[in-house]
Amino acid sequence: MKFFTASTLFLLAAQSLNSGVSASLSDPANTPTILADDIVHGYTPATYLSSVPTLLKRATTSYNYNTSSASSSSLTSSSAASSSLTSSSSLASSSTNSTTSASPTSSSLTSSSATSSSLASSSTTSSSLASSSITSSSLASSSITSSSLASSSTTSSSLASSSTNSTTSATPTSSATSSSLSSTAASNSATSSSLASSSLNSTTSATATSSSLSSTAASNSATSSSLASSSLNSTTSATATSSSISSTVSSSTPLTSSNSTTAATSASATSSSAQYNTSSLLPSSTPSSTPLSSANSTTATSASSTPLTSVNSTTTTSASSTPLSSVSSANSTTATSTSSTPLSSVNSTTATSASSTPLTSVNSTTATSASSTPLTSVNSTSATSASSTPLTSANSTTSTSVSSTAPSYNTSSVLPTSSVSSTPLSSANSTTATSASSTPLSSVNSTTATSASSTPLSSVNSTTATSASSTPLTSVNSTTATSASSTPLTSVNSTSATSASSTPLTSANSTTSTSVSSTAPSYNTSSVLPTSSVSSTPLSSANSTTATSASSTPLTSVNSTTATSASSTPFGNSTITSSASGSTGEFTNTNSGNGDVSGSVTTPTSTPLSNSTVAPTSTFTSSGFNTTSGLPTSSASTPLSNSTVAPTSTFTSSGFNTTSGLPTSSASTPSSNSSIVPTSTFTSSGFNTTSGLPTSSASTPLSNSTVAPTSTFTSSGFNTTSGLPTSSVSTPLSNSSAYPSSGSSTFSRLSSTLTSSIIPTETFGSTSGSATGTRPTGSSSQGSVVPTTSTGSSVTSTGTGTTTGVTEVTETSTFETTEIITSTIEPTTASGTGGGNPTAAPTNEPTVTTGTETTEGTATYTEPTTFTSTFSFTTTIIGGTTTIIPVNPGNPSSSVSAPPTTSFTPGPGGSGYPSYSNTTQGMNTTSIWNSSNSTIVSNVTATITGNVTITTGDLTTIDPTTFTSTYLSSGFQTVSNTTATSGSDDDVKTASTSSSTSYTSSSSSSSSTTSAASSKASVSMGLNGLMIAAVILLVA
């Protein structure tokens, strides 16, 4: 054990959650350490925010919204597993009394590897790796099975199909599509991509294949890509596999024959994993597999990625993308899956899940799994689907669930392109079992269930249940089991089923269930924001030897020897569950130092109307001008957020500002972040007799336009004093023989700079809490020290708080007006009489004068925004251990005649950390709270409303503003995000602040980015309750 003074802040490796938050230590001299003791007593991250009266979330932006994001987002799941499972290369079974057994060949694309084909013994019309087989499709050899630095790599791909008393058994062509196994520094790595289908009294059994995973630093790792599907007394069993992480090819397109004996089929297509696009602005959408089936055809199509079921199965193992299962074995000990696709079993010792989409069924009418977009229609000639939204047909025992699609971003636009949060539909007379995003389930009497990267799983009466990210599911004796996360569909009696975004399927009058699993987020290197994805929520439970969680994926184990996943390590064996409601906003700032946010903060405007890619056209008019700043007044146009094309604006106005010489105008207010600025035209007449500038309506676009509008105007009249034309609305200053000929002027916006700062101040109101548990008792005699321990204590604290702030937006514009004037003065003609000959009249030519006048100026205005928020929070800490260690016993011969008392009292004003006292008789004691085995649940919601006040000259307008703050408590770190949006007549402003706050409770500390260690706090108390010292106890 080591003791450190209270001024020492122990920082446990802070992790950046792809949000641009960087960790740094607070100044130990000014930032007191937050003790775990405090945490235990209900002081959530939100509570400690309260102790910082002023959280400066300050930032400025140049308004090109280049918020920085520290997300390099490679979806490579690094598996540090040595001697991981060796997967079987293929599955084959025999066929008897089968009317038709169509076994299209599986072409496996391998490079520099040995290709082994599976054996299909006693199989009628079964060919493996036959070049003449039906619909043999293989993909480009270059992008498949790329094995980097992998020696002794073996890739086998095979396909076998068998059927017993089955009307039809169709196995689509399996190409070891997108079977890109990137194995870095991996020796003895084997990748097998195989396909097997087996059916007993099954109408249809369809399986497809494949997919892959990236493994880093894995030795003796075997990746089983693609597996087998089996069904007992099941009407339909369809599986598909998931495409690999960086696969740009479309995953496998199977075809099935027509005029085949009718059979109810269910197919599932899968999600394509994330793709990376270095130069393209938009992420590529990965059309992962598009199967087709023709009329009256027994269609069994499968695309990419998938899972299956097993009954009394010995083993279910999956290393990368895709699970496998076997029929008729028992007492299996192991099931491990890493990336992509899960599975579950009944009466099996194993249930494993991994990344994308799983599912199983026993005596179930239907069990289908997929990943990304399917579709159905009833008696339709054609069914086409692009993206989300599922449909199911009538009178079928169908269940469909869809979850959200991860948003995608492009480089030039800061706002996300779109994100449709799915909408599942299921039709009448269907028995429905629906599972949404990140919802796991199932296996009975299973000994082990382990999940890793994305994709979950749980069990019944099993020792372990693990859940992760994506969406799996199983069913026992159920009519339907459906899982989804993105969009599915099926078709009944359909001639054609076509899907744009990966996968369709068809079936005729079958009891069908379709499941779709989430699409992995897409990233491109130059994109500022990550595509999506909730950054994990780790869970671990008691008595576990090891529980580590990764970035974006958690895991649990009970009485398990080991449960491991990649990155990020939760503290101790504690179970930490966090949830928060609210919106985190579209932009993230980089927070560093002691709280000052440096980076991009943009301030807010208007409520965005949906995620449209094209903004509607808006028109508005206004007149008048601000005589102080020279900026035009205008009617506010509410720009649409997230549009890639700015609306077109038209406007007219007249009049001129005699002070600044700037034209009055109705301002064209282009949407923020638009790449196209509207073009405006206007005309006016008259001239300013003081400055000699023409009056005009000026196009004054404010905000972030990349192209300034072009303006033209004409005027007439001329001023004889200055030689400038007089306007039609002004009286010439004198009588003269001069008159104007023509005049023209141009107005150009040279530059515009917009800065924004938001300075919220957060204060927390009262907090209250209580501690319960078993009071420890102890005694001491003749110099002995007897520590006592209590367990099961719990603390609950609640509180309210407010957030107020002021946002100021200042814009400075530089403009230039150039005028070209041409003036003509006619000569005077004279005549006279006299003696003799008459005098000839003068013959002078007209005098033409041409001149140019340029006026430059600068205009600045500031727009203040104020807001106030109120929120409440509740924190509950359950479990944990309190140990009281007697310190410096009083009378060595005395004993404790009464048990110590423990109390929990909020600190001064409810904003500090609590005082925690233990008082015994006859001795001083030190109380140590062990946060291991404790559960911390923190929920904080905040709703903020306010107004934006805009003052331009003598005109003041107030626009409604909505702010949303989210406080997420996880472990010993708090992440606070505030987003403000206001409606302005000038531009779109969105202010977003983000801070990461540790458990520091000092009024002088401002949102630091540190993470406090999982430390134990001990407080020494005397008989009189006086605090002697505070220390941090670290267990070496």
Curated annotation (Swiss-Prot):
GO terms for cellular component: external side of plasma membrane. It is a lipid-anchor; GPI-anchor. A lipid is attached at S1011 (GPI-anchor amidated serine). The keyword Signal applies. Keywords: Cell membrane, Glycoprotein, GPI-anchor, Lipoprotein, Membrane, Signal. Residues 586-595, 631-647, 693-709 have a biased composition (Polar residues). It is found in: Cell membrane. Residues 88-130, 147-183, 243-710, 722-862, 885-918, 978-1011 are annotated as: Disordered. One of its GO terms (biological process) is flocculation. Residues 1012-1036 form a propeptide. Residues 1-23 form the signal peptide. One of its GO terms (molecular function) is cell adhesion mediator activity. The keyword Lipoprotein applies. Residues 243-585, 597-630, 648-692, 722-831, 838-862, 885-906, 990-1011 have a biased composition (Low complexity). It comes from the Eukaryota. May be involved in agglutination during conjugation or other aspects of colony formation. Induces flocculation when overexpressed. This is Putative GPI-anchored protein pfl2. The gene is pfl2.
